[in-house]
């Protein structure tokens, strides 16, 4: 199965506007949450309060951001753009 197929299935199943949480796992570094918020605000304006949780050894950080997407293109774009942020390992 390809990413394009996954996006096509997701697009069929979703209804908009849709409340979603993006969870991003990355290397623990100063400014990670702020960098992620800047990306989200570029595509969906609003005030966001990220929830952060560090790994037990402090190596990794997970950041959750709640959004309301107006269309599937916003969702697809955020998955791709959040993955490009320095230190990001995974976007869920």
Swiss-Prot record:
NCBIfam families: PRK04998.1. One of its GO terms (cellular component) is cytosol. Gene3D superfamilies: 3.30.70.260. It comes from the Bacteria. Disulfide bonds: none annotated. Belongs to the UPF0250 family. The lineage of its organism: Bacteria, Pseudomonadati, Pseudomonadota, Gammaproteobacteria, Pasteurellales. PANTHER family: UPF0250 PROTEIN YBED (PTHR38036:SF1). This is UPF0250 protein HI_0028. Pfam families: DUF493.
